[in-house]
């Protein structure tokens, strides 16, 4: 009976530890998908593992996966790997909220309680993470796209009509990003198709109405698709010593940009 109770306790401790590590990996995945740098994600997950009572914490993060091994008291060792298939969508508001939540977990003892009170701390963390898994505010994204495309079209030498035309085509690009991108096998396919479709419509309406210049409108709308932040983050990762992640992000960004240019140039060649 003594051994049976001991085995039951070890099994319960292991299940609580596995659930806790799963929540910590959820945090890491959301940080990466929000645009956090690799070194920052590794540091955050390591601190959260130490805060929950892990005696040894080993975290390895690249842009495509997260690997975590944690050793707890009583000989409980948990190893989990999380595949990151989605490309990051840079949402600094969510990133700030996740950083604040991670500090709350480390300083408030929220994670440590989950190993001693039936996983209550992990449940609380899971509920808080679920709030930020719901995604971004679509209305704010559409409004921001109108401001960005219109202002950049004017900035690149366009007039008021060019800015208004660029803003008019911005909701189409946002709609394709929200509805069509999840069905594409990769970013290259999406960027090629999205830029070609948007370019065709811009050039056709420009020739049909003659009210705006297609090149200025394309330059303004292109700002919604250019992976500028991804490119800069790749350089930052390389300078910070995360060479593998930096090279992966840099290569992806250059390929995406090439697909974007090919799509718009193909549209101009077909129509003009």
Task: State what each model feature region is.
Residues 86-162, 249-261:
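Alpha-helical transmembrane segments and their cytosolic membrane-interface
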Residues 1-111, 120:
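Soluble N-terminal domains of membrane-associated systems
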Residues 134-208:
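Core alpha-helical transmembrane segments of integral membrane proteins
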Residues 2-21, 135-136, 250, 259-272:
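N-terminal charge/polar-biased segments
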Residues 206-272:
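Generic detector of multi-pass transmembrane helix bundles and their immediately adjacent loops
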Residues 129-137, 157-161, 182-190, 212, ...:
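Juxtamembrane/transmembrane-helix boundary motifs in multi-pass membrane proteins
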């Amino acid at each position: 009976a003594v051994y049976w109770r001991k085995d039951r306790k070890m099994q319960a401790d292991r299940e609580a530890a596995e659930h806790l590590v799963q929540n910590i990996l959820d945090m890491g995945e959301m940080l990466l998908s929000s645009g956090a740098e690799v070194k920052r994600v590794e540091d955050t997950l390591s601190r959260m593992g130490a805060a929950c009572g892990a005696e040894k914490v080993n975290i390895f993060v690249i842009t495509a996966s997260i690997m975590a091994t944690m050793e707890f008291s009583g000989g409980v060792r948990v190893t989990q790997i999380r595949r990151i298939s989605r490309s990051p969508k840079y949402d600094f508001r969510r990133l700030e909220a996740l950083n604040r939540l991670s500090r709350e977990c480390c300083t408030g003892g929220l994670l440590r309680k989950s190993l001693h009170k039936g996983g209550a701390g992990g449940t609380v963390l899971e509920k808080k993470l679920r709030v930020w898994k719901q995604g971004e505010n679509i209305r704010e994204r559409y409004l921001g796209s109108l401001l960005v495309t219109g202002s950049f079209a004017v900035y690149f030498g366009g007039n008021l009509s060019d800015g208004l035309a660029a803003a008019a085509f911005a909701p189409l690009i946002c709609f394709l990003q929200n509805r069509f991108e999840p069905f594409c096998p990769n970013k290259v396919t999406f960027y090629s198709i999205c830029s070609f479709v948007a370019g065709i419509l811009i050039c056709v309406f420009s020739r049909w109405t003659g009210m705006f210049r297609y090149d200025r409108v394309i330059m303004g709308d292109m700002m919604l698709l250019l992976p500028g932040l991804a490119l800069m983050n790749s350089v930052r990762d390389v300078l910070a010593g995360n060479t593998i992640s930096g090279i992966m992000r840099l290569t992806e960004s250059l390929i995406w940009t090439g697909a974007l240019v090919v799509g718009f140039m193909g549209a101009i060649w077909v129509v003009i």
